[in-house]
Amino acid sequence: AQGTPDAVMQPALLEAVYHTPVLTQSNPTTGRPLVFALAPDDAPQVPPDAPTAFVIAGGGSGAAVYYALLAAGWRVCTGVLNLLDTDEEAARALRLEHITEQPFSPISDDAYRRARQLAQTADAIIIADAPFGRGNLRNLELARWAQEHGKPIFALESRPIETRDFTDGAACTLWRLLVQDGMAIAPDLPTLLEHLAPLTPNRAAASSTSATA
């Protein structure tokens, strides 16, 4: 391919040429693209009957959460993510089922509907430490809808929601409602995984065995 590095180093193009999933990020010093090749077996293997987590992420907040959940034995799906978002690239590299929206576009009715259908099949909803603006506020609305329909909600909050709310308070309002109705808050990934342990069959079985020993 010919063109600038930014034009050529596109994940879809690289994957088509080299037949392997890749993740691209910008070098924080030079701004040039960095490409990470991921072997197909880089993602932990999860049995088909494992519990499923629907992750609400964006802006790079989800990649570590995806991998940690997979390593803990969860199946993972995610959305709604804008194309070109690093979390969308990570989801594609890990071969996760995910719902996308066009770059820099607000979440459309169609994307929201498809994300809601996907979330409906999940055993838990996880909200990553993502920023929320008018374009992705519907992701929080989706979490609220899922909570009202009986889904357990868990949130990773290493930064207060007030510092991530770019909606003139709408995100904070939804967040307070989620907390009020039982959303579990974790300050870091290990704590999040501990919150999820009762829903993870292997962990739950291990805890039961330990308790009866």
Label the predicted regions.
Residues 1-4, 8:
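ABC ATPase "signature
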Residues 5, 63-66, 136-140:
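Conserved strand-to-helix beginnings and helix N-cap segments that scaffold or border functional pockets
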Residues 11:
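Generic structural marker for isolated residues within well-ordered, non-membrane alpha-helices
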Residues 15-113, 124-128, 154-158, 162-168, ...:
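ABC ATPase nucleotide-binding domains
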Residues 119-120:
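A short, aliphatic-rich alpha-helical micro-motif
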Residues 135-153:
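A short, gly/pro- and small-residue-rich
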